[in-house]
Amino acid sequence: MLQITNMATPFLLLLLPLIFSTVLLLTITVTQSKPYSKTTPFQGNKPDKLTHLHFYFHDIISGDKPTTIRVAEAPGTNSSATVFGAVLIVDAPVTEGPELSSKEVGRAQGLYASTDMKTFGFTMVFNFVFTEGEFNGSTAALYGRNPILLEERELPIIGGTGDFRFARGYALPKTYKVVNIDAVVEYNVFIWH
């Protein structure tokens, strides 16, 4: 049979409360700590429909009332065949028809930058701000690469506000008309929201 000597008794009396305290502390810590994130079912705007928008974007760089202005450039931008490094800010009308006098349904606001050294390719960061019709007050956010010399192009819709909150989709821009350096671009936009 195991016997506890007189010397071992004080040691055990000190060790047992220490073990008990450690176990208790660990139990309290585990039960009181919370995870850094929590996933809950979203009860808000659930995706339920696909909307097709058709409009024209007026990119006016020349003249007295430009809608697009170059705000920055790299040292070699002007000698680059693709104006690589140019950054332009945009606040352009979005209309129902291809003529600037057509009914304005919104604005294209954002920027684009020449980001391709070999061909005309722009990285576009736009918000289509709708000011008329069913989606008045809503925006759709577009972000992507636009190789403007290609006839078929596709850019992602990555979100929005209002009716387009949590939206996703794509835009199909097609150059409708170019006069000097100004352009009218037809957009077919498909948004799941």
From Swiss-Prot:
Does the record's keyword annotation contain Signal?
yes
UniProt xrefs under Pfam families: Dirigent (PF03018)
Q: Name one GO biological process term.
A: phenylpropanoid biosynthetic process
Q: Does the keyword Transcription apply?
A: no
Q: Where are the transmembrane segments?
A: none
Q: Which UniProt keywords apply?
A: Apoplast, Glycoprotein, Secreted, Signal
Q: Which positions carry the signal peptide feature in this UniProt record?
A: 1-33
Q: Superkingdom of this entry's organism?
A: Eukaryota
Under what name is this protein listed?
A: Dirigent protein 11
- Give the chief site where it resides: secreted
Quaternary structure, from the entry:
Homodimer.
Its family?
A: Belongs to the plant dirigent protein family.
Location in the cell reads: Secreted, Extracellular space, Apoplast
Question: Cross-referenced PANTHER family, in alphabetical order?
Answer: NUCLEOPORIN-RELATED
Functionally, this protein is described as follows:
Dirigent proteins impart stereoselectivity on the phenoxy radical-coupling reaction, yielding optically active lignans from two molecules of coniferyl alcohol in the biosynthesis of lignans, flavonolignans, and alkaloids and thus plays a central role in plant secondary metabolism.
This chain's source organism reads Arabidopsis thaliana
- What Gene Ontology cellular-component terms does the record carry? apoplast
Residues the record marks as carrying a glycan: 78, 136
